[in-house]
Swiss-Prot record:
One of its GO terms (molecular function) is FAD binding. Coiled coil: none annotated. It catalyses: UDP-N-acetyl-alpha-D-muramate + NADP(+) = UDP-N-acetyl-3-O-(1-carboxyvinyl)-alpha-D-glucosamine + NADPH + H(+). It holds the Pfam family MurB_C. It comes from the Bacteria. Residues 18-189 form the FAD-binding PCMH-type domain. GO terms for biological process: cell division; cell wall organization; peptidoglycan biosynthetic process; regulation of cell shape. Its cofactor is FAD. Keywords: Cell cycle, Cell division, Cell shape, Cell wall biogenesis/degradation, Cytoplasm, FAD, Flavoprotein, NADP, Oxidoreductase, Peptidoglycan synthesis. Belongs to the MurB family. It comes from Pseudomonas fluorescens (strain ATCC BAA-477 / NRRL B-23932 / Pf-5). Signal peptide: none annotated. This is UDP-N-acetylenolpyruvoylglucosamine reductase.
Length: 339
């Protein structure tokens, strides 16, 4: 066995909230073989397996009585290039933002709007991560996953992944599928998505009239850096709540009493509301109790000022959910996975 399995390991360095909990067993997988070793170890010792990547979408509320396997696989490959469309494959353990930067350095567009999102490549399809008008599903070309029940590899295409807003098949069947590598369809000719006003405004402020994909990436990085705290400095998991999608009638009702409501009409006739706006209107922006709080600049972000437990952060989140439900009749859904 080459897999190094350690006992009673602190997970504080492995979750972006910086919550102090321990894993009963912990290992890092650098290859497919080591992933299989972890599965075999769990089967032999009748242990559950929790697979993590960058730990940026986790809220850990108690010690983990399982083998925690951190995906540390590395590798990026060009699979095909017809001069316009390029298919790139990346291992699940690759850190997301450096991977995005690598694609831009190769002259490839498609991922620039997803710049500076924390986490790993393997976690990106699970959440169908998205930002500034682009989601993983828009650039997805396939993935390879390991069936934890049979040990067999399976290829998934776009339809099989069942992508939806911050959702996928893998989020609902995390106990079965373990994503090993992901493929992306990118372009040698820029097809930029500049629908969001703040991005266009930032480019205009920089005097850029004909932006490249790299220009868009830099603009988005500067916007995100201003709005979102660095987890290395202040523990957080990025946006904590999904933007709720509600019936148009409810959105209109809220707008009557709150004319400044921020909402985006959807193709199905519903309206996607800005969760951060709702939370700010309810007075939670900058709230702090002990070391658990809401960020002073971005109401969507819950923060750990140093000593908050996962349970304290969870209780704060639930208080916010209850308040928003009472004020606006809107149910907020948490983005991070709870353990």
């Amino acid at each position: 066995m080459t897999l190094d399995i350690q006992a009673d390991v602190s997970l504080k360095p492995f979750n972006s909230f910086g919550v102090e909990v321990k894993a009963k067993w912990f290992a890092q997988a650098h290859s497919d073989d080591e992933v299989r070793e972890a599965l075999a170890y769990c089967a032999t010792h009748q242990l559950p397996l929790l697979v993590i990547g960058g730990g940026s979408n986790l809220l850990l509320t108690a010690d983990i009585q399982a083998l925690v396997l951190r995906m540390a696989t590395r590798g990026i490959r060009l699979l095909s290039d017809d001069g316009q469309r390029v298919v790139v494959e990346a291992e699940a353990g690759e850190t997301w933002h450096p991977f995005v930067q690598w694609t831009l350095e190769q002259g490839l567009s498609g991922l620039e709007n997803l710049s500076l999102i924390p986490g790993t490549v393997g976690a990106a399809p699970m959440q169908n991560i998205g930002a500034y008008g682009v989601e993983i599903k828009d650039v997805f070309a396939g993935l390879t996953a390991l069936d934890r029940q049979t040990g067999e590899l399976r290829e998934f295409d776009l339809a099989q992944c069942q992508f939806a807003y911050r959702d996928s098949l893998f989020k609902h069947q995390a106990g079965r599928w373990l994503i090993l590598r992901v493929r992306f369809a990118l372009n040698r000719v820029d097809h930029l998505h500049l629908e969001y006003g703040p991005v266009r405004q930032r480019l205009s402020e920089q005097g850029i009239e004909q932006p490249t994909a790299s220009d868009v990436s830099r603009a988005i990085c500067s916007i995100r850096s201003e709005k979102l705290p660095d987890p290395a400095v202040l523990g957080n998991a990025g946006s904590f709540f999904k933007n709720p999608v509600v019936p148009a009638a409810l959105a209109a009702q809220i707008k009557q009493s709150h004319p400044g409501l921020v909402g985006y009409p959807q193709a199905d006739g519903q309206v996607k509301l800005a969760a951060g706006w709702l939370i700010e209107q309810a007075g939670w922006k900058g709230f702090r109790e002990a070391d658990a709080g809401v960020h002073r600049l971005q109401s969507l972000v819950l923060v750990n000022y140093g000593g908050a437990s996962g349970l304290q952060l969870l209780e704060l989140a639930r208080r916010i959910q209850r308040d928003i439900a009472e004020r606006f009749s809107v149910e907020l859904e948490m983005e991070p996975n709870l353990y």
